């Protein structure tokens, strides 16, 4: 079996794994929140192969731009490159698999400082026109932003989902239920990842049960719709 086929199957299998329970989905989102520059399928494959990854880049970028050498024996994280006519594999390495040489540097990994919270809260309130009730804390504001983002893009997120649902648990659900559950899952997932990026604890507002419907997205074909919604923020 070719390596390309192995990675395709890994994506399918891992989609089933991360959608098997709320806790598994949250574990995936912990990784994805750190790798927000990557699209969903890349995030999924990175989580499958290196769940603790914090900053990934190609060998060339590490060597030529960051002056960090990849450690001898380090295993690259295989990703699917579907930009051309034929799908092929490309490889990235996490920063933990590199070491700095003369002139080298580390990528900037943003972390919110406590003194920045008020500034970020003010910016969100102005940018999204948040009501006063949604600006009591940064967590409240992030939840309001997540709701607004999903409300604005719900039709785009759902476009084509009904055709992909065949053979999945979604197939037995009616359109109204799918729409309602997707909206809530997407909102809570976006909020969860926004909180993780800001160093906040999302479970102060959420409970595991809020992600109970993730098990309906038991195939890559349908999980991709939810994953894309959460990763495009």
What are these regions (language model features)?
Residues 1-233:
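N-terminal accessory/interface modules of nucleic-acid-binding and processing proteins
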């Amino acid at each position: 079996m070719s390596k390309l086929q192995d990675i395709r199957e890994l994506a399918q299998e891992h989609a089933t794994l991360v959608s098997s329970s709320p806790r598994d989905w949250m574990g995936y989102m912990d990784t994805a929140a750190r790798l927000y520059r990557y699209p969903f399928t890349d995030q999924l494959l990175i989580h499958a192969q290196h769940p603790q990854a914090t900053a990934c880049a190609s060998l060339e970028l590490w060597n030529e731009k960051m002056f960090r050498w990849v450690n001898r024996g380090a295993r690259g994280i295989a990703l699917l490159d579907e930009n051309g006519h034929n799908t092929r594999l490309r490889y990235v390495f996490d920063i933990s698999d590199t070491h700095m040489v003369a002139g080298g540097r580390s990528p900037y990994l943003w972390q919110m400082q406590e003194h920045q919270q008020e500034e970020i809260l003010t910016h969100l309130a102005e940018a999204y026109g948040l009501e006063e009730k949604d600006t009591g804390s940064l967590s409240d504001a992030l939840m309001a932003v997540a709701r607004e983002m999903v409300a604005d893009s719900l039709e785009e997120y759902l476009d084509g989902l009904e055709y992909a649902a065949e053979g999945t648990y979604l197939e037995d659900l009616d359109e109204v239920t799918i729409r309602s559950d997707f909206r809530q899952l997407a909102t809570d997932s976006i909020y969860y990842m926004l909180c993780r990026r800001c160093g906040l604890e999302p479970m102060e507002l959420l409970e595991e049960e809020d992600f109970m419907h993730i098990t309906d997205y038991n195939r890559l074909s349908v999980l991709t719709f939810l994953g894309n919604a959460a990763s495009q923020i």
